[in-house]
Curated annotation (Swiss-Prot):
The keyword Signal does not apply. The lineage of its organism: Bacteria, Pseudomonadati, Thermodesulfobacteriota, Desulfuromonadia, Geobacterales. The gene is xseA. This is Exodeoxyribonuclease 7 large subunit. It comes from Geotalea daltonii (strain DSM 22248 / JCM 15807 / FRC-32) (Geobacter daltonii). It comes from the Bacteria. Pfam families: Exonuc_VII_L, tRNA_anti_2.
Amino acid sequence: MLFAEKNILSVSQLTGLVRNVLEDNFDHVWVEGEVSNLATPGSGHLYFTLKDASAQLRCVMFRASVRALKFKPSDGMGLIARGRLSVFDARGEYQLIVEYLEPKGIGALQLAFIQLKERLAKEGLFSDSHKKDIPRLPQRIGIVTSATGAAIHDILNVLNRRFANVQVLLRPVKVQGEGAAEEIAAAVNDLNRYGSIDVMIVGRGGGSLEDLWAFNEEIVARAIYRSSIPVISAVGHEIDFTISDFVADLRAPTPSAAAEMVIKSKAEISAELEALFHRLGMAVRRLLNEHWGELNGLVRAVKDPSMLLGHLAQRLDDLEGRSWRCIRQLLIRSADTNHFLHDRLRLQNPVLRLERCREQLLLVQSRIEKTMMHTVERAGQSLAFNAGKLQALSPLATMARGYSIVKKLPGGAVVTDRDQLAPGDSLDILLRKGRAICRVECTHD
């Protein structure tokens, strides 16, 4: 009878009662602590312990809630958790079913930004070696932004003011909210597949960190990194920085600034062209001055081509005389040799050997004569050719047709333009024969 009066419960019954008490009274609690024993099995759930100096609490965060996390928890991290208490029947342990997590002392989005930035930097996505140059004068600009936001209007206004002829291709997207990051990444990929785009602007106007968050998503960063088209990131205001700013080829503080940076104004382009024309003119004048200097050098070096021809003819005569002297000496030596051999052979009477030597001697003599004649003929042809070139290049041939060379005194600078002269200047005029000293009365066009 004693035991019959007692209400005896099974372990499962008692555990169920405890669970009901906990779930009814602690269905929405906030708790803070340090993470330990963090586990992430293949199921996608998150298991960890929150502890402080004197106690610990087992926690579980199911896969649906884990997917909403913007950052990655780790052991030793201080966290603030929101959830409900329950009991894990198999071990009889109470635990916190976590529905929301945020880092202690820093916002979840800010921590997620820092973690992703550090990871992508280690992978090299921000490396300067990967940055592409922005074209100096793009013909077609692709824009990824909202079709109804202020950013597209600011960009178009600036482009129309600076260079209205440029073509613009808008790929409209959501720039905030669920699915915005996926749309932005898809738009970047679409413009790369479309082709014929010289440069791309990806951005939006200002807003809170939450509003700009789509441009901090990894999927957007990797799409910009893979883009073969140079990308300018233009998100928010000058003080706003996003992951897309670091991975893009160029960061603009605002969408309007991106339009200013992507193309020069017509006035700037005109100024650059004018500077190029000025440099070209200076280069042409420098070349002309160099050639005039060469002409003056030729005039000083070659006073009269006939004199140079005379020297060359004299040298040719000298060579011809020396050649004939060599031939005569060879013939004399050959004759002496012939007489010597003849005397020796006459003593020995070798008729056949003498005849062969005589034939060889005549052959050598013929070859020597032909060689010398050919040498003299080639020297004469070279002389005639060089004489023709000198005659063609000589300013005297031009002066023989009535032209003259005018030099300004003193100094002897060659005059090619009336702007070099003034009334009263003295001139030295070189004629085909002789020269004349004149004075300038006036100049005309």
